[in-house]
Structure formats: structure tokens, C-alpha cells
């Protein structure tokens, strides 16, 4: 996403508790943004030392803003270790997060030997072991994205006992002791709101007169899934209450694509009138769309949604099987996380323009200092100006084979 799409979150967001999956996993969160300073500003640490100022609006796809952090990299001590969750729930961790985190660290002046990125491959025990090993090997800052909060709490407690700073990367760890971590992510309730409003717009544009909807969810152990659901359920509530839409089924929730397909097949088999689906990400939506295609569903007749702007998701959007996808420019998130790590590693206080929000942990009611970025809803109408312009997905890949005509219709040239 180009910088004109990035805005600082300036509203207080009050989130109602919602049922996630078949149970009643309730969660609420609030955030508020502080005013942003310019890149050239300076901030003063708790020790009175002048440090480079940086804002969530500073970051661009050329990583140039990270240059301002070189003095912090030079004065800081120890290594920065990032631990990512898996390779299956989303392609982002391998394709984008890992290389972007390394690129951001290099641009900030951190030697490659002082920046490590590990992937736990879906194993909670591996995640904890990776964190402990990183600390043993000299990490003074951890960037962690565990699949569940229990694992995150274990890591945060171990890190605190060893004097290591922690940044929750992309997911907030619920139930963590106060003051053990900061948080970097996109505004995840807004992600859900984009999914919900995109679905509504699509229902209208595709002329689905009587939407019979299955609402799907991410894993119930993932706080992000809860926040996404709060967003789209909030948008859709009035449509269900008024009878304009019919809520036919809700699924239990998963980030595993085969399991998501199984959940959808169960609902679709039990309710043949289902003609639309709210799906929280592209990876879980892909097998569902393939299933619908194999059952003769035509383009622009069965609205579905997604998130992460994967290659397959974008192609499904272009071909009329998915309404749109939430684009979260991961290069922005990676830079924000590494920037925060540079302050922590140097023992400095990050400016309010970087930690621009507070996120309330619904289990402890602790306010967690947060850096929140703003996502974008992508359709064929703005695909060229977002994911293609950013080279998030190369046009040559997007427009290959049978998608060439769809790209041409959307004004995308490879």
C-alpha cells in the first residue's frame, strides 16, 4: 500500500463482546491513538537522552524511514529475535513477515548476526523452545506471534525473568502480566469491519436479493479471530435483526484450510439454501471457493470474503468468486515492530507517535501500549493502486493463464 493509504488510528474504538464459534468466548478491546509527530522530530527517553523520533506514518515500501534508527542500533545491546507461528494458516509468514523483518532490521543498521527469525511450524512447544534458545543466545528483545495466548504468556514470563523485552507481533497475548510487552498490529476490529462492509457492498453489487449467510470464524484460541469477528458481526447485526439477511449457520472456527472446508461442507449440506459466506481469510476461503466451483456455482452469484491479499485470494476476487480481501501491508507492520525493538534494545522510550494507541486486554483489563496500523479493502477497482503498486503480488503472477482477461478488465497489465 502506498503511504496515502496509511492513516493513524485516531478514534476510540469500543468493542462489544460477541460469540465466537459455537461457544460464547467473549472478548472486548479498546484503543485510542495519540497524535503523530513527523519523522524529523526527536523524542526524549526516560533518562533525558535525545533519541530519533518516528511515527506509524513514517514507514513506506522503500524502508527509508528505518535509516533514522541507526543511532539506536549502534548504541543498543544484544540481539533481536522474531518467532513466527506457522507456515499453514497463512502464506504471509514465509513470503512476507520473515524477509520484511530482516530487511527492516538491516535498514535500521542492525547487523544480520543480531537479527534472527524463527518459525515454530505450528508447535507450541517449539515456539517456547525457540524463545528460550534465543534468550540463551543473547537476545535482548523478542518479537513473538504465538498461535495461542497460553504459549505467549509462558514466553513473556520467561523473558521477564531474564530481563528481556517483548513485543507482541500481530497478535495480542491475552492474560500476560502487566508491563511485560508492547503490541504491534493492524487495527483488527477495523479488519473485521472491512470484511463486513465489503460483504454488504458485494451482496448489493452482485444482486443477491435474499442472502442466506454462513458466518465463519478463525481459531477460537486466537484473539485476532475474536477481534475480526467483533468487526464483521457488528456490521452485519442490523441486517440479520431486520430480516434483510438470514443467518443460517455459524461455524466453530479454525485457521486450518482443510478444517474450514469441512465446517463449510457440514453447513452447506445441512442448509442447501446457503448462498453467501463471511470468511475471515483467503487461505480458509480458497478450498471453499474450489468446492463451490466444483458444484457449479457461477461467478458473482455467491459472495465470499477474505483477508491477507494472497495470490489465490486476489485471483478469486478478480474472477468473481470473492468480494474482496483485506490488504495489510506487512512491510509497514514489520518496520513498526523493528523500530520499537530498536528503542527497547537501546533502553530508550519509544515516542507516542510510534506507540500511538492503547489496547485493553479483555482478560486482565490491562492497557497495552500499541502501534496500530490501518488496513485496506481491496477489490478489482483498487487492486492496481494497492497490491500491484506495492509489488505485494507481481502482476505477472496475478495475471497468468486464465486470469489475464480478468486483469485486463480491471486495468492491470503484467
Predicted regions located by residue number:
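Bacterial N-terminal signal peptides that target proteins for export
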Residues: 1-9
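A residue-level marker of the well-folded mature domains of exported/periplasmic proteins
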Residues: 4, 22-414
Amino acid at each position: 500500500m502506498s503511504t496515502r493509504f496509511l492513516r493513524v488510528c485516531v478514534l476510540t474504538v469500543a468493542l462489544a463482546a460477541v460469540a465466537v464459534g459455537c461457544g460464547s468466548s467473549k472478548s472486548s478491546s479498546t484503543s485510542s491513538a495519540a497524535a503523530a509527530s513527523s519523522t524529523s522530530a526527536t523524542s526524549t527517553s526516560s533518562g533525558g537522552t535525545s533519541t530519533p523520533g518516528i511515527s506509524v506514518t513514517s514507514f513506506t515500501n522503500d524502508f527509508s524511514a528505518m535509516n533514522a534508527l541507526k543511532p539506536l542500533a549502534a548504541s543498543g545491546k544484544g540481539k533481536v529475535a522474531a518467532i513466527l507461528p506457522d507456515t499453514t494458516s497463512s502464506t504471509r509468514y514465509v513470503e512476507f513477515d520473515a524477509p520484511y523483518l530482516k530487511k527492516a532490521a538491516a535498514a535500521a543498521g542492525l547487523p544480520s548476526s543480531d537479527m534472527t527469525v524463527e518459525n515454530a511450524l505450528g508447535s507450541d512447544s517449539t515456539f517456547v523452545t525457540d524463545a528460550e534458545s534465543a534468550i540463551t543466545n543473547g537476545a535482548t528483545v523478542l518479537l513473538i506471534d504465538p498461535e495461542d495466548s497460553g504459549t505467549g504468556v509462558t514466553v513473556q514470563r520467561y523473558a521477564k525473568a531474564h530481563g528481556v523485552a517483548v513485543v507482541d507481533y500481530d497478535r495480542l497475548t491475552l492474560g500476560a502480566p502487566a508491563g511485560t510487552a508492547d503490541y504491534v498490529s493492524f487495527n483488527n476490529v477495523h479488519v473485521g469491519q472491512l470484511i463486513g462492509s465489503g460483504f454488504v457492498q458485494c451482496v448489493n453489487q452482485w444482486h443477491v436479493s435474499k442472502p442466506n449467510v454462513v458466518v465463519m470464524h478463525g481459531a477460537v484460541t486466537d484473539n485476532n479471530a475474536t477481534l475480526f469477528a467483533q468487526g464483521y458481526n457488528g456490521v452485519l447485526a442490523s441486517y440479520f435483526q431486520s430480516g434483510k439477511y438470514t443467518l443460517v449457520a455459524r461455524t466453530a472456527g479454525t485457521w486450518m484450510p482443510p478444517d474450514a472446508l469441512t465446517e463449510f461442507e457440514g453447513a452447506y449440506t445441512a442448509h442447501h439454501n446457503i448462498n453467501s459466506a463471511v470468511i475471515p481469510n483467503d487461505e480458509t476461503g480458497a478450498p471453499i471457493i474450489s468446492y463451490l466451483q466444483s458444484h457449479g456455482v457461477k461467478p458473482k452469484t455467491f459472495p465470499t470474503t477474505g483477508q491477507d491479499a494472497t495470490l489465490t485470494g486476489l485471483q478469486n476476487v478478480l474472477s468473481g468468486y470473492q468480494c474482496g480481501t483485506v490488504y495489510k501491508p506487512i512491510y509497514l507492520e514489520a518496520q513498526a515492530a523493528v523500530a520499537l525493538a530498536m528503542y527497547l534494545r537501546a533502553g530508550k522510550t519509544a515516542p507516542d507517535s510510534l506507540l500511538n494507541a492503547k489496547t485493553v486486554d479483555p482478560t486482565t483489563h490491562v492497557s497495552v501500549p500499541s502501534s496500530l496500523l490501518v488496513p485496506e479493502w481491496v477489490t478489482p477497482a483498487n487492486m492496481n493502486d494497492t497490491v500491484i503498486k506495492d509489488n505485494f503480488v507481481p502482476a505477472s503472477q496475478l495475471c497468468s493463464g486464465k486470469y489475464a482477461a480478468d486483469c485486463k478488465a480491471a486495468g492491470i497489465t503484467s
